[in-house]
Regions:
Chain B
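Membrane-water interface segments at the C-terminal ends of transmembrane alpha-helices
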Residues: 1-148, 175-196, 228-241, 266-297, ...
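Membrane-helix interface/capping residues of multi-pass secondary transporters
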Residues: 33, 153, 195, 222, ...
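Short helix-to-coil transition segments within interhelical loops
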Residues: 65, 153-177, 421, 427-447, ...
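Membrane-interface capping segments at transmembrane-helix boundaries
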Residues: 150, 245-253, 420-423, 515-527
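Short, highly charged, low-complexity non-transmembrane loops/tails of multi-pass membrane proteins
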Residues: 157-160, 428-431, 524-540
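Juxtamembrane inter-helical linkers in multi-pass membrane proteins
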Residues: 158-159, 163-167, 253-262, 299-306
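Glycine-rich helix-loop "coupling/hinge" segments at transmembrane-helix boundaries
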Residues: 194-222, 298-304, 465-493, 528-531
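Flexible interhelical linker loops that connect adjacent transmembrane helices
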Residues: 243-270
């Protein structure tokens, strides 16, 4: 009985304390100025250590500068979920980190608010980082990467996608991301299509799949950065890889990997503002400040992804810059990803891709 | 007379499969989905067959080791322990184990058992093996409930002159057909929803679950994804229903053997095989977490010795610490929404055996249907009620979603003591106990162990779920499972493996605490008996009373 009484007493005290706490937050400061609570901008990115750095180096300082609080949540690119919450009006985010795919589809579907390019200075951005519905967040490339310790003795390192398809010269498994985007392009480049002709008449998907079929038994598919890193370091001789992951393998894991920007497929990740964001103006202010380059060099140093702000690009040491996709020389070696073409054809290509994977 | 006994369950399975197959086929939208359906069925059959093979024979042998009477219990314990490892970590560790330049793949190539230059980790065989390590515990747990009831029957048949084939056909298989079918159907229905394992291993198998995920995430083709989710359910529900029906039948048919089984010659090695298989994943995970290399490499530990650095990092990592509170809140919400309704329902329907039976069947079906399709369908339903989605806190909504399988678990656990509880309540009532007394002194103490077990079960669901917490709330909840998933996306360091081991140890600790709490009255009685008796004897002046 003694314990029961004590438990009741403790519960009562906790309840009272909770009530008092609630009251405290609501009451006005007597005699002091009326402090208006800060607005909180709500961000969404892909989680993990990247999001931590993005928050620490970019989001928090900019929010401090424009006078708001920030909250960053992780999502795993569940665009269907994001689209559904925007459509039914329950989307909580003001700024979302998305890939080109969602930028184009979401923009066409009325899910995104147009960027006010009068407020956001496009001249501060690297070429290509501007879209009607998004501001570039980072630049990345799908590059040809290889593990130097797995190359046959005396064989020169691969230099183009043609070598990626050369099983005799470079025996061993190859890692490819399990999506048609990027793979169709690299297969066509390997099959002799010139970079400038790649999107000219639309991508020749069947030709690309025929080329990919020549190495199908040797392909190890990856879907996330972790798998790519693991495959390139322990399982595959080469990979079509996100440049940032190769950068990380070299820097953090000391794995003897190398890559080339020759024939790389250059893309951006984007900041977008959902159409029903509660703080569109403030989000726009954030983007206007973002293009000044605050903290983007940290992302470049830690993850190898290129800054989109020209100012940030200037602050990066040359030895690091030459490893980034934003470096003008590297950008020229690659092919810009055509998000528009993909947005129009993705559903059909995706079906054909799955059909090919299923052996037909 | 044997043929009808065999035919009835087989007929039921055939009807369920054919019915589900036709319904699913008609629901599927196009040729790609049909091809994916066939691939899924093939994968399901392969994994099921292997699980049955690797589960039934070794367990049969384990039950026939009089010198190792605890072996079947060890198998059950290891099976339960194996379920503590999150699927993401399991798949990553298997991927490291099967790596092309690793000892396993190299050995296979040297022996010419694997083609030169082709990856092992992303092969169809690797996916099948990974899924077998995932679902073998289910097979062992289901079979271990029924197989002991065989007792000495096969030995008696042998003594009476029946050969091995005759004994198998006339005694063993008819008796074990139902549990075998149940285990097979459960594994099969679970394989229909696999997505993380083929994805992480890098397989080109486009299963139905993978196709749904692609349609949702890549092309945002929600209507088509929904149709495929319905098709998956159309196939899974009849399968799960037949499995539930068999479990129900087996529950009532099960009997203790009159005499334990005789020794099975040469069965020791066979009985240890599942232990080895189930030890592979935790072993690989441990090796990965102890190595110095910052990537998941099996060779690292052997090249440069062990380190506990990754465990330290996992404990100190702000990312992991940040998700502790949300994970705890989601777990508590899931536990509350699982346990209280299950408790209420269990007590309310206690006097009605038919209703109890229906609830049991429903709970089993809920547990066995693929969770990916369930999550997608719940998401679609919830999207129609934006007000509810907006007003309920994210952690609560995520917990409520997890409570769907959690409720099923909790109800089944509580229902296990239903018959005993019913008798005890009737007895208490006869002795004049009031309703309040019956609840406090009879019902709750009887149900307490089940409540504790349900609490642990919800922890397991919370630690591995990324569907309900990501899809149901408008704002995703960052739990330990989603943190692992996010980290896997941006590079998996061995701290991820260490974090998974720590999570498994935490659950083990919970299980141990639950066990001690359950056994506490008995332990106290033993202590009192051992301390009290000499004291009483001394007081009475009786020497050598013990």
């Amino acid at each position: 009985m003694k314990w029961k009484r004590l438990a009741f007493l403790a519960t009562g005290l906790l309840f009272l304390a909770a009530c008092a706490q609630g009251q405290k937050t609501n009451e006005k400061q007597p005699g002091g100025p009326l402090v208006r609570p800060k607005v909180t901008l709500h961000f969404a990115s892909f989680g993990g250590s990247f999001q931590d750095d993005l928050d620490r180096a970019v989001i928090k300082p900019i929010c401090r500068e424009i006078g708001c609080d920030s909250q960053v949540d992780a999502y795993s690119g569940e665009y269907d979920h994001l689209a559904a919450t925007i459509k039914n009006g329950t989307n909580p985010f003001d700024l979302v980190h998305v890939e080109t795919r969602f930028l184009i589809q979401g923009g066409k579907g009325g899910l995104l608010a147009p960027i006010n390019w009068k407020e956001v200075d496009e001249n501060k951005l690297v070429p290509g980082a501007k879209n009607r519905f998004g501001v570039g967040l980072l630049a990345w490339s799908l590059v040809l990467a290889w593990n130097q310790s797995r190359l046959p003795a005396g064989t020169p390192p691969p230099s183009s996608w043609k070598d990626f398809f050369n099983i005799k010269k470079y025996p061993g498994p190859r890692a490819l991301r399990n999506t048609p985007e990027g793979n169709i392009e690299l297969a066509l480049l390997a099959d002799g299509v010139k970079p400038q002709d790649l999107y000219k008449n639309g991508l020749d998907v069947d030709r690309a799949l025929r080329k990919l079929s020549t190495i199908k038994p040797y392909i190890s598919w990856w879907t996330s950065g972790a798998e790519l890193e693991q495959k390139l370091s322990t399982s595959c001789i080469m990979a079509a890889a996100w440049n940032g992951r190769v950068f990380n393998l070299k820097k953090a894991a000391q794995v003897p990997v190398a890559f080339t920007y020759d024939g790389s497929i250059n893309q951006f990740d984007w900041w977008v503002i959902p159409a029903n964001s509660a703080h569109k103006n403030l989000a726009m202010k954030f983007l206007a400040a973002f293009v000044n380059g605050q903290g983007q060099d940290t992302i470049a140093k830690n993850f190898g992804y290129g800054p989109v702000a020209l100012k940030a690009l200037g602050a990066i040491p040359p030895d690091l810059l030459e490893q980034l996709p934003s470096d003008p020389t590297n950008a020229k070696l690659g092919v810009p990803f055509d998000g528009e073409w993909w947005a129009q054809n993705e559903a059909a290509v995706e079906k054909r891709w799955n059909q090919w994977l299923l052996g037909h | 007379m044997r043929i009808p006994r065999l035919a009835s369950p087989l007929l039921l399975i055939a009807l369920a499969l054919i019915g589900g197959w036709i319904a699913a086929w008609l629901l599927l939208p196009d040729e790609v989905a049909h091809l994916s359906f066939l691939v899924t069925i093939k994968l399901g059959i392969e994994v099921t067959a292997l699980c049955l093979l690797l589960g039934s024979f070794p367990l049969y042998a384990a039950l026939r080791q009089p010198k190792w009477p605890k072996l079947p219990h060890v198998l059950v314990a290891v099976s339960l322990g194996s379920l503590l490892i999150p699927t993401i970590a399991r798949s990553l560790s298997l991927s490291a184990l099967f790596s092309f330049y690793g000892p396993l793949a190299t050995g296979l190539r040297v022996m010419r058992l694997w083609p030169q230059g082709q990856p092992l980790d992303s092969s169809h065989a690797a996916v099948v093996i990974a899924l077998v390590t995932l679902y073998l515990p289910f097979t062992l747990l289901i079979l271990s409930e029924s197989m002991p009831s065989l007792g000495r029957m096969p030995d008696v048949a042998g003594t009476l002159g029946a050969g091995v084939l005759q004994t198998s056909l006339r005694v063993t298989i008819p008796r074990l057909l139902r549990p075998l079918a149940t285990a097979g159907l459960v594994v099969f229905s679970q394989v229909l929803g696999v997505i993380i394992t083929p994805r992480i291993l890098g397989s080109e198998d486009v299963t139905l679950a993978v196709l749904i995920d692609d349609l949702l995430k890549r092309t945002m083709n929600t209507p088509e994804a929904l149709r495929i989710a319905w098709a998956e359910m159309a196939l899974a529900i009849p399968v799960a229903a037949v499995a539930a029906y068999f479990i129900e039948k087996e529950r009532t048919a099960r009997a203790r053997p009159l005499q334990p089984a005789l020794r099975f010659r040469g069965g020791r090695v066979l009985s240890v095989i599942p232990l080895v298989i189930l030890a592979v994943v935790p072993g690989a995970l441990l090796i990965l977490s102890l190595g110095h290399s910052p990537i998941l490499s099996m060779a690292s530990l052997f090249q440069s010795g062990p380190t506990l650095e990754w465990f330290r990092r996992a404990l100190l990592e702000p990312g992991f610490r940040r998700v502790l509170l949300p994970s705890f809140m989601v777990w508590m919400a899931a536990a509350a929404f699982s346990i209280f309704p299950a408790l209420l329902v269990s007590v309310l329907i206690l006097p009605y055996p038919q209703v109890r039976r229906s609830f049991r069947l429903l709970a089993l079906v809920l547990l066995f249907v693929p969770q990916n399709a369930l999550g997608v369908l719940l998401f679609m339903v919830l999207s129609r009620f934006p007000a509810a989605q907006a007003s309920i806190p994210a952690w609560l909504l995520g917990g409520m979603g997890q409570a769907v399988p959690g409720f099923a678990f909790a109800f089944l656990l509580m229902d296990r003591v239903g018959d005993r509880l019913r008798r005890s309540l009737a007895l208490a009532s006869t002795l004049g106990a009031s309703a309040w007394q019956r609840l406090l002194k009879v019902a709750l103490p009887n149900l307490a162990p089940s409540v504790a077990a349900a609490f642990v079960a919800t922890a397991l669901i919370t630690l591995d779920d990324i569907i309900f917490v990501r899809y149901l709330p408008r704002l995703p909840v960052n739990t330990a499972a989603t943190e692992l998933f996010g980290r896997a996306r941006y590079g998996a360091a061995p701290d991820l493996a260490a974090a998974c081991i720590l999570m498994a140890l935490f659950i083990l600790l919970l299980v141990a605490c639950g066990h001690i709490a359950r056994e506490f009255p008995a332990i106290r009685r033993r202590l009192v008996a051992s301390v009290g008796r000499p004291k009483v004897a001394a007081e009475l002046g009786v020497e050598g009373a013990r």
